Amino acid sequence: MANPLYHKHIISINDLSRDELELVLRTAASLKKTPQPELLKHKVIASCFFEASTRTRLSFETSIHRLGASVVGFSDSSNTSLGKKGETLADTMSVISTYVDAIVMRHPQEGASRLAAQFSGNVPIVNAGDGANQHPTQTLLDLFTIQETQGRLDNINIAMVGDLKYGRTVHSLTQALAKFNGNHFFFIAPDALAMPAYILQMLEEKEIEYSLHESLEEVVPELDILYMTRVQKERLDPSEYANVKAQFILRSSDLTGARDNLKVLHPLPRIDEITTDVDKTPYAYYFQQAGNGIFARQALLALVLNAELAL
């Protein structure tokens, strides 16, 4: 069967249809069950991280190795020609694309990955995060985790808590879940970090239910998924950060009355928005969620680099 993701740029979660999302998730489930250590043998993938990352970079590079491919790249752009000599991103991507079969890229500037795709020829760009904009592979592992724990991606009650303004993970996840049916979103954030208007407008246009809240306590009994986020210090001025950083903290006592199937997710890193006593509850699933990144990213890379793939 022809693979619709072959050589496709993955810049935004909106680049993927529901059918394509489900294809990635089926492939991820297959790879989790049955590893394929030679699936990308002889392929070379560039890991270009212009912004600090731990989980995403290591997850991608582990995924690449476990599929049998080789990885080249950098985790500190200050030591590259772009950082030291002023080379443009366009020229950097034009050159790197002559060396490799695919490029995984994180950049602090919104839209940088889509710009890179204009100069990479037929070498696919996979966006590993561009500023506060999109983080599509985090969304894929989030969807995989929700499906794994709930058995479905339709009719999910999900609360998103914390920094909904700058948190690219919640933007992408909301857009992805909007492709499925019957989902209800509970947005819990201070006014300074509220979900952007364009996301709310998208939900309204699709007639998808959402509600805004100031308290976590009032919605916990209704939830299937509780998606916590950290306040992103690097994207706020110090006075704003000080005002909001501790406004929403999840403690194990807050989960009294939760449904048995509730899972608490977090894109990590965690700072102090989830206390460690939550780790010991049956609701905590954020470390397993991070581990699922291996399978979601393996699936995406396998599909992007194989014209036909049947696992």
From Swiss-Prot:
Pathway: Pyrimidine metabolism; UMP biosynthesis via de novo pathway; (S)-dihydroorotate from bicarbonate: step 2/3. It is an enzyme of class 2 (transferase). The keyword Transferase applies. It holds the Pfam family OTCace. It catalyses: carbamoyl phosphate + L-aspartate = N-carbamoyl-L-aspartate + phosphate + H(+). PROSITE patterns: CARBAMOYLTRANSFERASE. Its EC number is 2.1.3.2. GO terms for biological process: 'de novo' pyrimidine nucleobase biosynthetic process; 'de novo' UMP biosynthetic process; amino acid metabolic process. Catalyzes the condensation of carbamoyl phosphate and aspartate to form carbamoyl aspartate and inorganic phosphate, the committed step in the de novo pyrimidine nucleotide biosynthesis pathway. HAMAP family: Asp_carb_tr. Belongs to the aspartate/ornithine carbamoyltransferase superfamily. ATCase family. This is Aspartate carbamoyltransferase catalytic subunit.
